[in-house]
Amino acid sequence: MRWLSAASSAFAVVLWLSGPPFAIGPLVFIALVPLLAIAEVSPSSSWKRPLYAASLAYWLLSLQGLRYAHPLMFLPWIALSGYLAIYPVLFIALLRRLRLVDNCDVSQARRDRVPLCLVAAVVWVGLEWIRNYFFTGISVLMLGHALADMPMLIQIADLGGTYAVSFVIVCVNVAMFDALNRWVVQRTSSVSDSPMKSLVTAGGLLIATMVYGAMSMNAETEPTGKTIALLGDNELTVYEQDIVREQEIFATYGQMAIDAVAKSNTRIDAVVWPESMFSGGLPWMTTGADLVVPDFMQNPAAAPLQPEQLRFAVESKQNDFLDRANSIQRAMRASSTVPTEAPPAIIGGCGLVQYADRPSQYSGVVWVNATGNMSGTYSKNHLVLFGETIPLVHSLPWIRDIVPPGLGLDRGTQPERFDLDGISLMPNLCIETAVERIPVNHMHQLNSRANPKLPDAIVTLTNDVWFHDSAVVDHHLRCAQLVAVGCRRPILSAANGGPTVWIDSAGRVVERLAKGQSDVIYAQPRRDSRISLYVRIGSWPAGLMGAATLCGLAWMTFEWLMRRRKRSVIA
Protein backbone atom coordinates (compact mmCIF):
# COMPACT_ATOMS: atom_id res chain seq x y z
CA MET A 1 0.00 0.00 0.00
CA ARG A 2 2.85 2.40 0.78
CA TRP A 3 4.47 1.69 -2.58
CA LEU A 4 1.19 2.38 -4.37
CA SER A 5 0.73 5.62 -2.46
CA ALA A 6 4.28 6.69 -3.31
CA ALA A 7 3.82 5.91 -7.01
CA SER A 8 0.47 7.71 -7.12
CA SER A 9 1.93 10.74 -5.37
CA ALA A 10 4.93 10.78 -7.72
CA PHE A 11 2.58 10.85 -10.71
CA ALA A 12 0.59 13.76 -9.28
CA VAL A 13 3.64 15.79 -8.19
CA VAL A 14 5.57 15.41 -11.46
CA LEU A 15 2.49 16.22 -13.54
CA TRP A 16 1.81 19.28 -11.40
CA LEU A 17 5.40 20.51 -11.74
CA SER A 18 5.19 20.19 -15.53
CA GLY A 19 2.48 22.86 -15.66
CA PRO A 20 1.94 26.29 -14.09
CA PRO A 21 3.03 27.74 -11.77
CA PHE A 22 6.40 25.94 -12.17
CA ALA A 23 5.91 25.05 -15.85
CA ILE A 24 8.81 22.58 -16.15
CA GLY A 25 7.43 21.24 -19.41
CA PRO A 26 9.92 18.40 -20.14
CA LEU A 27 8.83 16.64 -16.92
CA VAL A 28 5.64 15.64 -18.72
CA PHE A 29 7.68 13.05 -20.64
CA ILE A 30 8.12 11.03 -17.42
CA ALA A 31 4.93 11.99 -15.57
CA LEU A 32 3.06 8.82 -16.54
CA VAL A 33 5.88 6.41 -15.67
CA PRO A 34 4.56 5.87 -12.10
CA LEU A 35 1.10 5.21 -13.54
CA LEU A 36 2.46 2.50 -15.81
CA ALA A 37 4.18 0.93 -12.82
CA ILE A 38 0.83 0.85 -11.00
CA ALA A 39 -0.65 -0.98 -14.00
CA GLU A 40 1.56 -3.98 -13.15
CA VAL A 41 0.34 -4.63 -9.62
CA SER A 42 -1.65 -7.78 -8.95
CA PRO A 43 -5.45 -7.67 -9.31
CA SER A 44 -5.82 -8.10 -5.55
CA SER A 45 -3.90 -4.89 -4.81
CA SER A 46 -5.86 -1.85 -3.66
CA TRP A 47 -4.41 0.58 -6.21
CA LYS A 48 -7.55 2.57 -7.04
CA ARG A 49 -7.94 4.43 -3.75
CA PRO A 50 -4.41 5.90 -3.48
CA LEU A 51 -4.38 6.78 -7.18
CA TYR A 52 -7.72 8.54 -6.95
CA ALA A 53 -6.63 10.41 -3.81
CA ALA A 54 -3.42 11.63 -5.49
CA SER A 55 -5.30 12.63 -8.64
CA LEU A 56 -7.87 14.50 -6.57
CA ALA A 57 -5.09 16.41 -4.80
CA TYR A 58 -3.55 17.26 -8.19
CA TRP A 59 -6.78 18.70 -9.58
CA LEU A 60 -7.69 20.53 -6.37
CA LEU A 61 -4.29 22.22 -6.38
CA SER A 62 -4.28 22.96 -10.12
CA LEU A 63 -7.78 24.45 -10.14
CA GLN A 64 -7.76 26.07 -6.70
CA GLY A 65 -8.15 29.50 -8.31
CA LEU A 66 -11.78 28.67 -9.10
CA ARG A 67 -12.73 29.02 -5.45
CA TYR A 68 -12.09 32.78 -5.48
CA ALA A 69 -14.94 33.52 -7.87
CA HIS A 70 -17.74 33.22 -5.30
CA PRO A 71 -18.25 31.51 -1.91
CA LEU A 72 -20.61 29.07 -3.61
CA MET A 73 -17.81 28.01 -5.99
CA PHE A 74 -16.14 25.88 -3.30
CA LEU A 75 -18.55 23.03 -4.00
CA PRO A 76 -18.20 23.18 -7.82
CA TRP A 77 -14.39 23.36 -7.42
CA ILE A 78 -14.40 20.20 -5.31
CA ALA A 79 -16.98 18.48 -7.53
CA LEU A 80 -15.08 19.27 -10.75
CA SER A 81 -11.79 18.09 -9.23
CA GLY A 82 -13.45 14.91 -8.00
CA TYR A 83 -14.84 14.23 -11.46
CA LEU A 84 -11.55 14.87 -13.29
CA ALA A 85 -9.64 12.68 -10.78
CA ILE A 86 -11.53 9.67 -12.12
CA TYR A 87 -9.72 9.76 -15.48
CA PRO A 88 -6.26 8.48 -14.38
CA VAL A 89 -8.03 5.61 -12.59
CA LEU A 90 -9.96 4.77 -15.77
CA PHE A 91 -6.72 4.96 -17.77
CA ILE A 92 -5.02 2.34 -15.62
CA ALA A 93 -8.13 0.17 -15.40
CA LEU A 94 -8.48 0.10 -19.19
CA LEU A 95 -4.78 -0.46 -19.72
CA ARG A 96 -4.77 -3.40 -17.31
CA ARG A 97 -7.84 -4.88 -18.96
CA LEU A 98 -6.43 -4.53 -22.46
CA ARG A 99 -2.97 -5.89 -21.62
CA LEU A 100 -3.62 -8.35 -18.81
CA VAL A 101 -5.95 -11.30 -19.25
CA ASP A 102 -6.19 -14.64 -17.52
CA ASN A 103 -4.77 -16.44 -20.54
CA CYS A 104 -1.07 -15.56 -20.74
CA ASP A 105 -0.82 -16.74 -24.35
CA VAL A 106 -3.57 -14.36 -25.39
CA SER A 107 -1.89 -11.55 -23.46
CA GLN A 108 1.42 -12.21 -25.21
CA ALA A 109 -0.32 -12.32 -28.58
CA ARG A 110 -1.88 -8.95 -27.91
CA ARG A 111 1.47 -7.46 -26.94
CA ASP A 112 3.06 -8.79 -30.10
CA ARG A 113 0.27 -7.40 -32.23
CA VAL A 114 -0.04 -3.81 -30.93
CA PRO A 115 2.78 -1.97 -29.09
CA LEU A 116 1.87 -0.84 -25.59
CA CYS A 117 2.82 2.76 -26.36
CA LEU A 118 0.12 2.93 -29.04
CA VAL A 119 -2.47 1.21 -26.85
CA ALA A 120 -1.74 3.58 -23.97
CA ALA A 121 -1.79 6.64 -26.24
CA VAL A 122 -5.14 5.66 -27.76
CA VAL A 123 -6.67 5.14 -24.31
CA TRP A 124 -5.30 8.40 -22.88
CA VAL A 125 -6.35 10.50 -25.89
CA GLY A 126 -9.72 8.75 -25.93
CA LEU A 127 -10.27 9.79 -22.32
CA GLU A 128 -9.18 13.37 -23.11
CA TRP A 129 -11.71 13.45 -25.94
CA ILE A 130 -14.45 12.24 -23.60
CA ARG A 131 -13.74 14.96 -21.03
CA ASN A 132 -13.72 17.56 -23.82
CA TYR A 133 -17.36 16.72 -24.52
CA PHE A 134 -18.88 15.16 -21.41
CA PHE A 135 -20.67 17.46 -18.96
CA THR A 136 -20.23 20.48 -21.33
CA GLY A 137 -16.52 19.72 -21.73
CA ILE A 138 -13.23 21.11 -20.43
CA SER A 139 -9.85 21.20 -22.20
CA VAL A 140 -7.77 22.72 -19.41
CA LEU A 141 -4.66 20.72 -18.47
CA MET A 142 -4.70 18.28 -21.33
CA LEU A 143 -1.34 16.54 -21.37
CA GLY A 144 -0.19 18.46 -24.46
CA HIS A 145 -0.60 21.83 -22.73
CA ALA A 146 2.56 21.14 -20.71
CA LEU A 147 4.57 21.78 -23.90
CA ALA A 148 2.93 25.12 -24.75
CA ASP A 149 6.24 26.95 -24.25
CA MET A 150 8.10 24.55 -26.56
CA PRO A 151 6.80 25.71 -29.97
CA MET A 152 8.57 23.09 -32.06
CA LEU A 153 6.76 20.28 -30.25
CA ILE A 154 3.24 21.68 -30.53
CA GLN A 155 3.05 22.39 -34.27
CA ILE A 156 1.39 19.00 -34.84
CA ALA A 157 -1.68 20.52 -33.17
CA ASP A 158 -2.68 21.77 -36.63
CA LEU A 159 -3.05 18.10 -37.60
CA GLY A 160 -4.99 16.79 -34.62
CA GLY A 161 -5.22 19.48 -31.98
CA THR A 162 -3.80 19.11 -28.49
CA TYR A 163 -4.82 15.45 -28.78
CA ALA A 164 -1.93 14.89 -31.23
CA VAL A 165 0.59 16.39 -28.80
CA SER A 166 -0.79 14.29 -25.95
CA PHE A 167 -0.51 11.16 -28.12
CA VAL A 168 3.22 11.68 -28.64
CA ILE A 169 3.79 12.46 -24.95
CA VAL A 170 2.14 9.19 -23.86
CA CYS A 171 4.22 7.19 -26.34
CA VAL A 172 7.43 8.73 -24.97
CA ASN A 173 6.33 7.95 -21.40
CA VAL A 174 5.80 4.30 -22.28
CA ALA A 175 9.21 4.13 -23.94
CA MET A 176 10.80 5.62 -20.82
CA PHE A 177 8.95 3.11 -18.65
CA ASP A 178 9.99 0.16 -20.81
CA ALA A 179 13.63 1.23 -20.89
CA LEU A 180 13.70 1.89 -17.14
CA ASN A 181 11.98 -1.39 -16.40
CA ARG A 182 14.27 -3.51 -18.54
CA TRP A 183 17.69 -1.88 -18.17
CA VAL A 184 17.58 -0.20 -14.75
CA VAL A 185 15.19 -2.29 -12.68
CA GLN A 186 16.17 -5.29 -14.82
CA ARG A 187 13.01 -7.30 -14.59
CA THR A 188 10.49 -8.61 -17.06
CA SER A 189 7.29 -6.58 -17.21
CA SER A 190 3.85 -8.16 -17.44
CA VAL A 191 2.47 -5.29 -19.49
CA SER A 192 5.36 -3.61 -21.28
CA ASP A 193 6.93 -4.49 -24.60
CA SER A 194 10.50 -4.94 -25.64
CA PRO A 195 12.12 -1.58 -24.88
CA MET A 196 13.46 -1.42 -28.43
CA LYS A 197 9.94 -1.65 -29.86
CA SER A 198 8.62 1.23 -27.76
CA LEU A 199 11.80 3.29 -28.12
CA VAL A 200 11.70 3.01 -31.91
CA THR A 201 7.99 3.87 -32.03
CA ALA A 202 8.20 6.80 -29.61
CA GLY A 203 11.52 8.01 -31.00
CA GLY A 204 10.16 7.98 -34.53
CA LEU A 205 7.09 9.95 -33.49
CA LEU A 206 9.16 12.47 -31.52
CA ILE A 207 11.60 13.03 -34.38
CA ALA A 208 8.75 13.41 -36.86
CA THR A 209 7.10 15.89 -34.49
CA MET A 210 10.27 17.99 -34.29
CA VAL A 211 10.87 17.93 -38.05
CA TYR A 212 7.28 18.90 -38.75
CA GLY A 213 7.49 21.59 -36.09
CA ALA A 214 10.65 23.13 -37.56
CA MET A 215 9.10 23.19 -41.03
CA SER A 216 5.79 24.62 -39.83
CA MET A 217 7.37 27.43 -37.84
CA ASN A 218 9.18 28.61 -40.97
CA ALA A 219 5.97 28.94 -43.00
CA GLU A 220 5.54 32.34 -44.62
CA THR A 221 3.03 34.82 -43.26
CA GLU A 222 2.27 38.34 -44.44
CA PRO A 223 1.55 41.52 -42.51
CA THR A 224 -2.04 42.70 -42.30
CA GLY A 225 -0.91 46.29 -41.86
CA LYS A 226 -3.48 46.69 -39.09
CA THR A 227 -3.04 47.54 -35.42
CA ILE A 228 -5.46 46.23 -32.80
CA ALA A 229 -5.25 47.70 -29.30
CA LEU A 230 -5.92 45.11 -26.58
CA LEU A 231 -6.94 46.65 -23.27
CA GLY A 232 -5.98 44.89 -20.04
CA ASP A 233 -6.84 45.94 -16.50
CA ASN A 234 -7.76 44.41 -13.14
CA GLU A 235 -11.14 45.87 -12.23
CA LEU A 236 -12.71 43.82 -9.44
CA THR A 237 -16.13 42.46 -10.32
CA VAL A 238 -18.79 40.53 -8.44
CA TYR A 239 -21.86 38.58 -9.49
CA GLU A 240 -24.30 40.95 -7.81
CA GLN A 241 -22.87 44.15 -9.27
CA ASP A 242 -24.88 47.39 -9.16
CA ILE A 243 -25.17 49.81 -12.04
CA VAL A 244 -22.96 52.42 -10.37
CA ARG A 245 -20.04 49.98 -10.24
CA GLU A 246 -20.64 48.94 -13.86
CA GLN A 247 -20.51 52.58 -14.93
CA GLU A 248 -17.28 53.10 -12.97
CA ILE A 249 -15.69 50.16 -14.79
CA PHE A 250 -16.94 51.48 -18.14
CA ALA A 251 -15.45 54.91 -17.41
CA THR A 252 -12.10 53.37 -16.45
CA TYR A 253 -11.87 51.35 -19.64
CA GLY A 254 -13.14 54.30 -21.68
CA GLN A 255 -10.23 56.40 -20.43
CA MET A 256 -7.85 53.51 -21.12
CA ALA A 257 -9.10 53.36 -24.71
CA ILE A 258 -8.58 57.09 -25.19
CA ASP A 259 -5.09 56.95 -23.64
CA ALA A 260 -4.19 53.91 -25.76
CA VAL A 261 -4.89 55.83 -28.95
CA ALA A 262 -3.07 58.91 -27.65
CA LYS A 263 0.10 56.94 -26.84
CA SER A 264 0.24 55.03 -30.12
CA ASN A 265 2.63 56.06 -32.88
CA THR A 266 0.58 54.17 -35.44
CA ARG A 267 -3.04 54.33 -36.51
CA ILE A 268 -5.29 52.16 -34.35
CA ASP A 269 -7.87 50.24 -36.36
CA ALA A 270 -9.80 48.73 -33.46
CA VAL A 271 -9.78 48.81 -29.67
CA VAL A 272 -10.79 45.61 -27.87
CA TRP A 273 -12.44 45.79 -24.44
CA PRO A 274 -12.51 42.65 -22.25
CA GLU A 275 -15.56 40.56 -21.49
CA SER A 276 -18.50 42.51 -19.97
CA MET A 277 -16.47 45.72 -19.64
CA PHE A 278 -18.39 47.55 -22.39
CA SER A 279 -21.83 47.02 -20.84
CA GLY A 280 -21.68 49.83 -18.30
CA GLY A 281 -25.18 49.06 -17.11
CA LEU A 282 -26.58 49.36 -20.65
CA PRO A 283 -26.71 46.12 -22.67
CA TRP A 284 -27.28 46.10 -26.43
CA MET A 285 -30.97 45.37 -27.02
CA THR A 286 -32.77 44.09 -30.10
CA THR A 287 -36.28 42.94 -31.00
CA GLY A 288 -37.54 40.11 -33.17
CA ALA A 289 -40.37 40.01 -35.70
CA ASP A 290 -42.54 37.90 -33.39
CA LEU A 291 -42.30 40.36 -30.51
CA VAL A 292 -44.26 39.56 -27.35
CA VAL A 293 -44.18 41.85 -24.31
CA PRO A 294 -42.91 39.84 -21.30
CA ASP A 295 -45.24 39.55 -18.31
CA PHE A 296 -42.74 41.17 -15.95
CA MET A 297 -43.01 44.40 -17.97
CA GLN A 298 -46.76 44.65 -17.57
CA ASN A 299 -48.27 46.77 -14.82
CA PRO A 300 -51.68 45.49 -13.67
CA ALA A 301 -52.64 49.03 -12.64
CA ALA A 302 -51.96 50.49 -16.10
CA ALA A 303 -52.96 49.83 -19.69
CA PRO A 304 -51.21 46.80 -21.25
CA LEU A 305 -47.87 47.59 -22.86
CA GLN A 306 -48.06 46.93 -26.60
CA PRO A 307 -45.31 45.38 -28.76
CA GLU A 308 -44.96 48.64 -30.73
CA GLN A 309 -44.27 50.51 -27.51
CA LEU A 310 -41.63 47.99 -26.46
CA ARG A 311 -40.00 48.19 -29.89
CA PHE A 312 -39.86 51.99 -29.62
CA ALA A 313 -38.31 51.74 -26.14
CA VAL A 314 -35.66 49.31 -27.40
CA GLU A 315 -34.80 51.59 -30.32
CA SER A 316 -34.39 54.44 -27.84
CA LYS A 317 -31.98 52.29 -25.78
CA GLN A 318 -30.06 51.44 -28.96
CA ASN A 319 -29.61 55.14 -29.68
CA ASP A 320 -28.38 55.71 -26.12
CA PHE A 321 -25.94 52.82 -26.49
CA LEU A 322 -24.51 54.11 -29.77
CA ASP A 323 -24.35 57.71 -28.53
CA ARG A 324 -22.23 56.53 -25.62
CA ALA A 325 -19.97 54.47 -27.91
CA ASN A 326 -19.65 57.36 -30.37
CA SER A 327 -18.57 59.71 -27.59
CA ILE A 328 -15.70 57.34 -26.78
CA GLN A 329 -14.81 57.14 -30.48
CA ARG A 330 -14.79 60.92 -30.88
CA ALA A 331 -12.53 61.24 -27.85
CA MET A 332 -10.18 58.58 -29.23
CA ARG A 333 -9.96 60.37 -32.57
CA ALA A 334 -9.34 63.71 -30.88
CA SER A 335 -6.52 62.24 -28.77
CA SER A 336 -4.75 60.58 -31.69
CA THR A 337 -1.35 61.97 -32.66
CA VAL A 338 -1.61 60.22 -36.02
CA PRO A 339 -3.73 61.89 -38.73
CA THR A 340 -6.84 59.80 -39.32
CA GLU A 341 -10.14 60.27 -41.07
CA ALA A 342 -12.10 57.91 -38.83
CA PRO A 343 -11.86 56.77 -35.22
CA PRO A 344 -10.98 53.19 -34.26
CA ALA A 345 -13.71 50.59 -34.27
CA ILE A 346 -14.72 49.21 -30.88
CA ILE A 347 -14.98 45.49 -30.17
CA GLY A 348 -16.31 45.13 -26.66
CA GLY A 349 -17.60 42.50 -24.28
CA CYS A 350 -21.19 43.42 -23.57
CA GLY A 351 -24.49 41.98 -22.43
CA LEU A 352 -26.99 41.28 -25.20
CA VAL A 353 -30.76 41.24 -24.72
CA GLN A 354 -33.27 40.17 -27.35
CA TYR A 355 -37.02 40.52 -27.06
CA ALA A 356 -38.96 38.20 -29.35
CA ASP A 357 -41.53 35.53 -28.49
CA ARG A 358 -39.64 35.39 -25.19
CA PRO A 359 -36.85 37.53 -23.73
CA SER A 360 -33.31 36.17 -24.07
CA GLN A 361 -30.10 37.43 -22.53
CA TYR A 362 -26.59 36.57 -23.65
CA SER A 363 -23.03 37.24 -22.71
CA GLY A 364 -21.80 38.74 -25.94
CA VAL A 365 -19.48 40.84 -28.06
CA VAL A 366 -20.43 43.97 -29.99
CA TRP A 367 -18.66 45.55 -32.94
CA VAL A 368 -19.19 49.28 -33.39
CA ASN A 369 -17.53 50.20 -36.67
CA ALA A 370 -15.49 53.29 -37.51
CA THR A 371 -18.62 55.15 -38.65
CA GLY A 372 -20.25 54.63 -35.26
CA ASN A 373 -22.81 52.03 -36.33
CA MET A 374 -23.47 48.59 -34.89
CA SER A 375 -21.97 46.22 -37.47
CA GLY A 376 -22.11 42.89 -35.69
CA THR A 377 -22.68 40.98 -32.49
CA TYR A 378 -21.65 37.59 -31.18
CA SER A 379 -23.55 35.59 -28.56
CA LYS A 380 -21.42 33.31 -26.43
CA ASN A 381 -21.85 29.69 -27.53
CA HIS A 382 -20.36 27.90 -24.53
CA LEU A 383 -21.61 28.86 -21.08
CA VAL A 384 -19.55 28.36 -17.94
CA LEU A 385 -21.02 25.53 -15.90
CA PHE A 386 -21.92 26.82 -12.41
CA GLY A 387 -20.73 30.29 -13.48
CA GLU A 388 -23.29 31.23 -16.14
CA THR A 389 -25.60 28.26 -16.10
CA ILE A 390 -26.55 25.66 -13.51
CA PRO A 391 -28.27 22.37 -14.40
CA LEU A 392 -31.93 22.25 -13.34
CA VAL A 393 -31.83 25.84 -12.02
CA HIS A 394 -35.18 26.57 -13.66
CA SER A 395 -36.73 23.25 -12.60
CA LEU A 396 -35.77 23.10 -8.93
CA PRO A 397 -36.83 26.16 -6.89
CA TRP A 398 -34.45 25.39 -4.03
CA ILE A 399 -31.50 25.69 -6.43
CA ARG A 400 -32.88 28.88 -7.97
CA ASP A 401 -33.28 30.48 -4.54
CA ILE A 402 -29.64 30.05 -3.44
CA VAL A 403 -27.77 31.05 -6.59
CA PRO A 404 -26.83 34.68 -7.26
CA PRO A 405 -28.51 36.66 -10.06
CA GLY A 406 -27.14 36.43 -13.60
CA LEU A 407 -26.80 32.65 -13.78
CA GLY A 408 -29.57 32.18 -16.31
CA LEU A 409 -27.92 33.17 -19.58
CA ASP A 410 -28.97 31.86 -22.97
CA ARG A 411 -26.53 30.19 -25.33
CA GLY A 412 -25.60 31.42 -28.79
CA THR A 413 -25.67 28.90 -31.60
CA GLN A 414 -23.23 29.99 -34.31
CA PRO A 415 -19.89 31.67 -34.97
CA GLU A 416 -19.56 35.20 -36.27
CA ARG A 417 -16.95 37.02 -38.30
CA PHE A 418 -16.25 40.73 -37.97
CA ASP A 419 -14.99 42.00 -41.33
CA LEU A 420 -13.21 45.23 -40.51
CA ASP A 421 -11.49 47.26 -43.18
CA GLY A 422 -8.52 45.15 -44.24
CA ILE A 423 -8.77 42.49 -41.52
CA SER A 424 -11.30 39.87 -40.51
CA LEU A 425 -11.68 38.78 -36.89
CA MET A 426 -13.56 35.88 -35.28
CA PRO A 427 -14.78 36.69 -31.77
CA ASN A 428 -14.56 34.23 -28.88
CA LEU A 429 -15.64 34.96 -25.34
CA CYS A 430 -14.45 33.99 -21.88
CA ILE A 431 -13.36 30.35 -21.56
CA GLU A 432 -14.28 29.38 -25.12
CA THR A 433 -10.58 29.12 -25.97
CA ALA A 434 -10.27 26.81 -22.93
CA VAL A 435 -12.77 24.44 -24.54
CA GLU A 436 -10.77 23.63 -27.64
CA ARG A 437 -13.61 22.29 -29.74
CA ILE A 438 -15.46 25.64 -29.64
CA PRO A 439 -13.03 27.83 -31.68
CA VAL A 440 -12.05 24.87 -33.88
CA ASN A 441 -15.68 24.09 -34.66
CA HIS A 442 -16.31 27.78 -35.32
CA MET A 443 -13.48 27.84 -37.84
CA HIS A 444 -14.76 24.62 -39.39
CA GLN A 445 -18.28 26.04 -39.72
CA LEU A 446 -17.02 29.24 -41.35
CA ASN A 447 -14.92 27.17 -43.74
CA SER A 448 -17.94 24.98 -44.62
CA ARG A 449 -20.29 27.80 -45.59
CA ALA A 450 -21.44 28.33 -49.17
CA ASN A 451 -19.01 31.24 -49.48
CA PRO A 452 -16.24 30.21 -47.11
CA LYS A 453 -14.02 32.89 -45.69
CA LEU A 454 -11.83 32.32 -42.69
CA PRO A 455 -10.83 35.15 -40.35
CA ASP A 456 -7.32 36.53 -40.22
CA ALA A 457 -7.23 36.27 -36.43
CA ILE A 458 -9.25 35.14 -33.43
CA VAL A 459 -10.07 37.89 -30.96
CA THR A 460 -10.96 36.62 -27.52
CA LEU A 461 -12.42 38.71 -24.72
CA THR A 462 -12.28 37.37 -21.19
CA ASN A 463 -12.67 38.33 -17.55
CA ASP A 464 -10.38 36.17 -15.40
CA VAL A 465 -10.20 38.56 -12.46
CA TRP A 466 -12.36 36.04 -10.58
CA PHE A 467 -9.30 33.78 -10.26
CA HIS A 468 -7.04 36.29 -8.45
CA ASP A 469 -3.93 35.81 -10.64
CA SER A 470 -3.84 32.09 -9.83
CA ALA A 471 -2.49 29.37 -12.13
CA VAL A 472 -5.95 29.12 -13.71
CA VAL A 473 -5.03 32.24 -15.73
CA ASP A 474 -1.89 30.52 -17.03
CA HIS A 475 -3.86 27.40 -17.92
CA HIS A 476 -6.23 29.59 -19.94
CA LEU A 477 -3.26 31.09 -21.78
CA ARG A 478 -1.84 27.67 -22.63
CA CYS A 479 -5.17 26.56 -24.03
CA ALA A 480 -5.16 29.64 -26.27
CA GLN A 481 -1.63 28.87 -27.50
CA LEU A 482 -2.64 25.40 -28.64
CA VAL A 483 -5.83 26.76 -30.23
CA ALA A 484 -3.71 29.26 -32.19
CA VAL A 485 -1.69 26.39 -33.65
CA GLY A 486 -4.73 24.18 -34.22
CA CYS A 487 -6.53 26.92 -36.15
CA ARG A 488 -3.36 28.46 -37.64
CA ARG A 489 -4.57 31.89 -36.67
CA PRO A 490 -3.13 34.51 -34.32
CA ILE A 491 -5.05 34.99 -31.10
CA LEU A 492 -5.57 38.49 -29.74
CA SER A 493 -6.80 38.35 -26.16
CA ALA A 494 -8.08 41.32 -24.16
CA ALA A 495 -8.63 40.38 -20.54
CA ASN A 496 -9.69 41.88 -17.27
CA GLY A 497 -7.43 40.25 -14.70
CA GLY A 498 -6.37 37.59 -17.15
CA PRO A 499 -4.16 36.79 -20.12
CA THR A 500 -4.04 39.98 -22.19
CA VAL A 501 -1.80 38.57 -24.87
CA TRP A 502 -0.87 38.52 -28.54
CA ILE A 503 -0.14 34.98 -29.78
CA ASP A 504 1.04 34.24 -33.31
CA SER A 505 -0.23 31.40 -35.51
CA ALA A 506 2.61 29.15 -34.30
CA GLY A 507 1.45 29.44 -30.69
CA ARG A 508 4.31 31.73 -29.66
CA VAL A 509 3.58 34.54 -27.23
CA VAL A 510 4.57 37.74 -29.04
CA GLU A 511 3.62 40.04 -26.18
CA ARG A 512 1.84 39.58 -22.87
CA LEU A 513 0.88 41.79 -19.97
CA ALA A 514 2.20 40.55 -16.63
CA LYS A 515 -0.32 39.47 -14.02
CA GLY A 516 -1.74 42.50 -12.27
CA GLN A 517 -0.45 44.88 -14.95
CA SER A 518 -2.78 47.53 -16.35
CA ASP A 519 -1.72 48.46 -19.87
CA VAL A 520 -2.39 47.99 -23.56
CA ILE A 521 -0.90 45.73 -26.22
CA TYR A 522 -0.68 47.06 -29.77
CA ALA A 523 -1.05 43.85 -31.74
CA GLN A 524 -0.13 43.78 -35.41
CA PRO A 525 -1.17 40.25 -36.42
CA ARG A 526 0.26 38.60 -39.49
CA ARG A 527 -1.96 36.82 -41.99
CA ASP A 528 -1.48 33.03 -42.17
CA SER A 529 -3.19 31.62 -45.25
CA ARG A 530 -2.96 27.98 -44.15
CA ILE A 531 -6.14 26.05 -43.44
CA SER A 532 -5.15 23.39 -40.94
CA LEU A 533 -6.18 19.76 -41.23
CA TYR A 534 -7.68 20.11 -37.75
CA VAL A 535 -10.01 22.86 -39.01
CA ARG A 536 -10.88 20.90 -42.16
CA ILE A 537 -11.82 17.60 -40.52
CA GLY A 538 -12.22 18.42 -36.84
CA SER A 539 -11.36 16.00 -34.05
CA TRP A 540 -12.81 12.82 -35.53
CA PRO A 541 -9.51 10.86 -35.24
CA ALA A 542 -9.53 11.56 -31.49
CA GLY A 543 -13.26 10.85 -31.57
CA LEU A 544 -12.57 7.35 -32.88
CA MET A 545 -10.18 6.81 -29.98
CA GLY A 546 -12.86 8.14 -27.66
CA ALA A 547 -15.42 5.74 -29.13
CA ALA A 548 -13.01 2.82 -28.69
CA THR A 549 -12.37 3.91 -25.11
CA LEU A 550 -16.10 4.14 -24.41
CA CYS A 551 -16.54 0.61 -25.78
CA GLY A 552 -13.78 -0.56 -23.46
CA LEU A 553 -15.42 1.14 -20.49
CA ALA A 554 -18.79 -0.37 -21.41
CA TRP A 555 -17.25 -3.84 -21.66
CA MET A 556 -15.52 -3.47 -18.29
CA THR A 557 -18.80 -2.35 -16.74
CA PHE A 558 -20.59 -5.33 -18.27
CA GLU A 559 -17.97 -7.75 -16.92
CA TRP A 560 -18.22 -6.16 -13.47
CA LEU A 561 -22.00 -6.54 -13.47
CA MET A 562 -21.71 -10.17 -14.57
CA ARG A 563 -19.24 -10.90 -11.77
CA ARG A 564 -21.56 -9.32 -9.22
CA ARG A 565 -24.47 -11.31 -10.55
CA LYS A 566 -22.46 -14.51 -10.42
CA ARG A 567 -21.41 -13.86 -6.82
CA SER A 568 -24.99 -13.12 -5.80
CA VAL A 569 -26.20 -16.37 -7.42
CA ILE A 570 -23.50 -18.38 -5.62
CA ALA A 571 -24.38 -16.70 -2.33
Swiss-Prot record:
Superkingdom of the source species: Bacteria
Gene Ontology biological process terms from the UniProt entry: lipoprotein biosynthetic process
Active site positions, chain numbering: E275, K380, C430
Transmembrane feature ranges: 13-33, 51-68, 72-92, 118-138, 152-172, 199-219, 542-562
Pathway: Protein modification; lipoprotein biosynthesis (N-acyl transfer)
Cellular location(s): Cell inner membrane
Domain spans labelled CN hydrolase: 234-527
Listed PROSITE patterns: CN_HYDROLASE
UniProt keywords, alphabetically: Acyltransferase, Cell inner membrane, Cell membrane, Membrane, Transferase, Transmembrane, Transmembrane helix
Keyword field contains Transmembrane helix: yes
EC number: 2.3.1.269
Topology term for the membrane: Multi-pass membrane protein
Pfam families, sorted: CN_hydrolase, LNT_N
A Gene Ontology molecular function term of the record: N-acyltransferase activity
One GO CC term on file: plasma membrane
HAMAP family: Lnt
Function: Catalyzes the phospholipid dependent N-acylation of the N-terminal cysteine of apolipoprotein, the last step in lipoprotein maturation.
Family: Belongs to the CN hydrolase family. Apolipoprotein N-acyltransferase subfamily.
Protein name: Apolipoprotein N-acyltransferase
Organism: Rhodopirellula baltica (strain DSM 10527 / NCIMB 13988 / SH1)
